[in-house]
A protein has these predicted regions:
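Elongated, amphipathic alpha-helical interaction scaffolds
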Residues: 1-316
Length: 316
């Protein structure tokens, strides 16, 4: 099965909500416990004409000598620090070019301080806050093979990497991070609206199930979005955005729905392919062990660590 997704980038609702400096400043203040009032302090640096790893970063901006990268995600991706590395490299390159900084000069070049925040509102249970690190992706250097200092001793037994990216992952599902929500009205309203869409979707799914009607998930979701928009406008939730951009918001959410369905499909396909490969490897391992009369080791293959050790031993 070949899975396809239209890679033409469309704005997310999150980016739409925070596309003006006033609301973006409110979000920044809430995250950093600051009280800036002048939104002219913000310089938008979002890369508008490039898509990295199939996805464009949502919002990046400079304020107070800080380079902030904000991104919305409906699934937790452990490779977000890798994406962050690529984003920041491009953003800093642009900053150096724009400011005519001489990086080959003897004088140190001053750069804005990086901050990377990902706002998560998927359906999987996640803690309110967590950190993801680029160093978790690095292959660890075996003990004793670290850098040596001039005396020939190990300079750093922990083999600290030369590059690091830290992602602050915040759960913004309704009911999470209440203190943050209370400091940023727009974030609270965004969280409420997404929760409302899900409630309507669950309600319609149950309704059509009872009525024994055959309605596909996307049609149910589209109807749920329409109902949620009407109710949100009545309740003054994102009213300014929803009332003026109803069709655009609907299109954004349906696009996000398609992307989620695509990602879920890729995960399922990868899992099935992985299972098939795993079964083949295991069968080959058992054959090798039987050939060598190592019956006691066959019982050990149920342990993942032992299994991986045996794979390496037999180069499988």
């Amino acid at each position: 099965m070949e899975l396809k997704l239209n890679r033409k980038y469309k704005d997310t609702l999150f980016r739409k909500v925070f596309n003006n400096k006033k609301d973006l400043l409110s979000l920044y203040n809430a995250l950093n416990n600051t009280e800036h009032m002048d939104d002219s302090l913000i310089t938008i640096t979002t890369i508008e004409d490039a898509i990295y790893i199939g996805y464009k970063n949502d919002i990046s901006f400079i304020i107070n000598s800080e380079l902030n990268l904000y991104e919305h995600q409906s699934s937790v991706n452990p490779n977000m620090p890798v994406r962050g590395l690529i984003y920041f490299a491009e953003l800093y390159k642009g900053y150096i070019d724009q400011n005519n900084l001489l990086i080959y000069n003897e004088r140190i070049v001053k750069m804005p301080f990086p901050r990377y925040v990902v706002f998560y509102n998927g359906t999987e249970e996640q803690p309110e806050e967590q950190e993801l690190r680029l160093s978790d992706s690095f292959v660890q250097v075996p003990e004793g093979e670290g850098l040596k200092d001039t005396a020939g001793t190990e300079a750093d037994k922990t083999n600290k990497p030369s590059v690091e990216v830290v992602v602050q992952l915040l759960n913004i599902n309704y009911g999470c991070n209440q203190e943050l929500m209370e400091k940023c009205q727009k974030l609270m309203e965004y969280s409420k609206f997404i929760a409302l869409v899900r409630v309507k979707s669950d309600m319609l799914t149950e309704k059509y199930k009872k009525e024994m009607k055959s309605v596909n998930k996307k049609e149910i979701f589209a109807e749920a979005v329409a109902l949620a928009i009407d109710e949100a406008i009545r309740d003054n939730v994102l009213k300014d955005i929803l009332s003026k951009n109803m069709a655009e918001v609907t299109d954004m959410l349906l696009t996000e729905f398609d992307e989620k369905a695509y990602i879920d499909g890729v995960k399922k396909q990868s899992y099935e392919e992985g299972e098939a490969i795993g079964e083949d490897k295991l069968a080959r391992l058992v054959v090798e062990l039987k050939k060598r009369g190592r019956v006691e080791d066959i019982a050990k293959v149920t342990d993942e660590g032992e299994r991986e050790r045996l794979y390496r031993e037999f180069n499988i």
